[in-house]
């Protein structure tokens, strides 16, 4: 079953948007080869992506993304000094140390294509992958993994944890980054199987 009579048009628009984002430097560099591979497949195209990140964020209260402020954001492993530098910028609200796994949204031409992509992603370690949206206009697969950390570090300019604790959470976060970067490599190595 073909969900979108407009698949080719939607793919063309998504590729134009990606090209603009690439020129502006808005795409995580380490995920670009995977995006290019997915977009080279006849029945798929990417609509958005993040290669996973570690961040330090200040927000009035947890979940208030509208008024949140990045104090540090990295799409790679980080040093304790980088995290401490970000923490020093904290002034008000809650201070959070966060890890988020990679996330990709991929348009699929048919339900069978979407199922094949979800199964491949899960087999590569992206256990939270699913069909995110089905309508007569689009069919979107979300590729997502399990790595995540939400650690309260401080509030209203006061740091609640010591350096030893920070060192440990940075160590754990970096291990998660290594794990999800390996999953991205695995997915990139196996994505061509969808062309068969």
Curated annotation (Swiss-Prot):
Keywords: Methyltransferase, S-adenosyl-L-methionine, Transferase, tRNA processing. The keyword Cell inner membrane does not apply. InterPro entries: Taw3, tRNA_yW-synthesising, tRNA_yW-synthesising-like_sf. GO terms for molecular function: tRNA methyltransferase activity. GO terms for biological process: tRNA methylation; wybutosine biosynthetic process. It is an enzyme of class 2 (transferase). Gene3D superfamilies: tRNA wybutosine-synthesizing-like. Its EC number is 2.1.1.282. HAMAP family: TYW3_archaea. Belongs to the TYW3 family. S-adenosyl-L-methionine-dependent methyltransferase that acts as a component of the wyosine derivatives biosynthesis pathway. This is tRNA(Phe) 7-((3-amino-3-carboxypropyl)-4-demethylwyosine(37)-N(4))-methyltransferase 1. It comes from Pyrococcus furiosus (strain ATCC 43587 / DSM 3638 / JCM 8422 / Vc1). The gene is taw3-1.
């Amino acid at each position: 079953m073909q969900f979108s009579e407009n698949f080719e048009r939607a793919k063309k628009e998504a590729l134009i948007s990606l090209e603009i984002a690439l020129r502006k430097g808005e795409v995580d560099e380490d995920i670009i080869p995977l995006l290019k591979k997915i977009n080279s497949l006849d029945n798929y195209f990417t609509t958005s992506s993040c290669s996973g990140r570690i961040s330090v964020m200040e927000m009035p209260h947890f979940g208030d993304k509208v008024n949140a402020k990045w104090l540090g954001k990295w799409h790679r492993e980080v040093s304790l000094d980088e995290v401490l530098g970000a923490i020093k910028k904290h002034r008000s609200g809650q201070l959070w140390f966060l890890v988020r796994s990679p996330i990709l949204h991929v348009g699929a031409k048919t339900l069978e294509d979407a199922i094949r992509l979800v199964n491949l992603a899960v087999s590569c370690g992206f256990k939270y992958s699913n069909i995110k949206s089905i309508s007569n206009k689009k069919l979107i697969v979300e590729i997502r993994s399990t790595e995540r950390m939400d650690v309260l570090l401080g509030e209203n300019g006061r740091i609640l944890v010591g350096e030893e604790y920070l060192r440990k959470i940075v160590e754990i976060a970096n291990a998660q980054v290594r794990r999800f970067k390996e999953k991205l490599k695995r997915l990139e190595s196996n994505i061509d199987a969808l062309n068969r």
